[in-house]
Design a protein with these regions (language model features):
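Short connector loops/turns at beta-strand edges and beta->alpha or beta->beta junctions
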Residues: 19-23, 96-100, 171-174
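Solvent-exposed, polar/charged alpha-helical surfaces in well-ordered, non-transmembrane soluble domains
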Residues: 41-49, 76, 119-123, 156, ...
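Alpha-helical metal-binding/catalytic segments enriched in His/Glu/Asp
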Residues: 2, 16-71, 198
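Proline/glycine-enriched tight loop/beta-turn segments at coil->beta junctions
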Residues: 6-13
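Metal-dependent peptidase/peptidase-like ectodomains
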Residues: 9, 55-56, 65-167
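His/Asp/Glu-rich mid-to-C-terminal helical/loop segments that flank catalytic regions of hydrolases
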Residues: 49, 169, 173-218
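Second-shell loop/turn segments in exported
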Residues: 27-37, 50, 64-65, 103-111, ...
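A non-catalytic alpha/beta surface segment that caps or lines the substrate-entry region
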Residues: 1-4, 135
Length: 218
């Protein structure tokens, strides 16, 4: 975990998370997990680096979760034994598989529960060369394409605890949970655009001002 303190201190927090575990090795075969979820961890670190030194109202807590692939155990432990007051968390931003999207599309779930967050993401994505697909967070959508992703990753336990969330991700692809999920298949252009949208979203959520730090993610 790492914290960028804001003017409000612990009274107002934004959590940015990504799980760092993957399948590992099965039958002697390495599963690299480039998209799931090295892409999310690297994007989180880029956002943290870009925001370091900038002035924000809310404090920003960055968390790398373990054991997501074993039932969201890391996130559940965090929520069950929170090191911060969850009532002060205005949003949990979860990055899970953000490296490669069909038709240049980034999925953003969570806005059905907290509609005000949709405008925050839309503003952050304006002018970017990617499409934003909102939704994927309604129980009634279970039979639809994409379905309901409310509990599909580390944001789930936070949602159950009453914390608003934004889940940035992509549809499953043919290399999901396979040894072929390698870094060479992540398009640099798409990944850069996604990371910039996440950065601008977090900056808006935290009430950030563009001063003192880098203006974009490396």
């Amino acid at each position: 975990m790492g914290m960028i303190p804001g003017r409000a201190g612990a009274a107002r927090l934004v959590i940015v998370g990504a799980h760092y575990d993957h399948v590992g090795v099965r039958n002697g075969q390495l599963y690299p997990g480039a998209d799931d979820n090295a892409s999310g961890v690297a994007a989180m670190l880029a956002v943290a680096g870009a925001l370091t030194g900038q002035v924000t109202e809310a404090s920003i807590l960055f968390v790398a979760f373990d054991a997501e692939e074993q039932g969201l155990r890391g996130a559940r432990h965090f929520v069950n034994h929170p090191p911060v007051d969850l009532r002060s968390v205005t949003a949990m931003v979860n990055l899970d598989m953000v490296g490669r999207g069909d038709a240049n599309t980034l999925v953003v779930a969570g806005t059905s529960y907290t509609p005000s967050l949709r405008a925050v993401v839309a503003d952050a994505a304006r002018g970017r060369e990617l499409a934003i697909a909102f939704g994927y967070d309604r129980p009634s959508a279970a039979g639809e394409r994409g379905g309901d992703w409310t509990h599909s990753s580390d944001h789930g336990p936070f949602h159950d605890a009453g914390v608003p969330f934004l889940y940035f991700g992509v549809e499953n692809h043919g290399d999901y949970h396979k040894p072929t999920d390698t870094a060479d298949k992540i398009p640099a252009g798409f990944y850069t655009e996604v990371t910039q949208v996440v950065l601008d979203t977090v900056r808006r959520l935290a009430g950030g001002e563009r001063s003192g730090g880098r203006d974009s993610a490396p």
